[in-house]
Amino acid sequence: MMDEDKDHTRGAELVAQMEGALNQAFDEISFEMGFNGEKHELILTPEGDKVKLFELIYFQKHAPKEVLEHWNILVGRQPLQNIGLRTENGLDISGDDVQIWLEEQGENSFAISAYCEKLLPMLREEEGRAWWMLTTLTDQVLGEIPHMRYIDSFDVLEEPKAEPSFLLSQLPDKLREQGLELSTDPEAYLESYLGYKMEPKQDPDADWRLDVMAGSTCCVPLDRKSVV
């Protein structure tokens, strides 16, 4: 169908068909489709959820070879130069339209504050939509995997800060200056782990997980759920 859609008029139909296929494997799934000049591309996005990332990689690694002859299946939005988004009223937003303030929170951990004058009307009327556009644009400028790996806090401002800022389009270079590797390999990201210690519960009726004294995890969100 994508090959036949030369005039790009069947986008909604294509998305619905792909969504129906993916919903056989996932309860909820966010994805994008494209064409790189040689193959069609299916980009599966975890939307910042590390638990979902494990699921998407499993799906990617088990794709039939017949499918991979015609499709590239990628996990995480890929960084693209000169990328931009368009609002429903036809307003184009690029990385050059967004001011960024970057604050170091810890080792390889940063907070972002973003200000975009073009999106102020949307921010006031459709705050969630404005947040989605700015976080998605950051994914596309930086790459979704580096975004998940290094940006632990994201704030959208209604007015700029007094401190000096830089453009969102410069964010990859700013992070490289910090010595960070901006790999888009999701498996490499999942190989990183966190060690922890805790006081074990002595109550014999406590949940099993609560008698652990020390451990490590590659998926902090899932580990937190197990101790709640």
Predicted regions and their residues:
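Short, flexible loop/turn elements at secondary-structure junctions
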Residues: 46-48, 75-77, 116
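Long, disordered, Ser/Thr/Pro-rich
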Residues: 1-6, 38, 86-89, 213, ...
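Long, hydrophobic alpha/beta structural blocks
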Residues: 81, 93-218
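An N-terminal, globular interaction/scaffold subdomain
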Residues: 9-71
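Long, charge-dense
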Residues: 64-85
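Generic structural motif
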Residues: 29-33, 73, 89, 98-102
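Conserved small/polar residues in nucleotide/adenosyl-binding loops
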Residues: 225-227
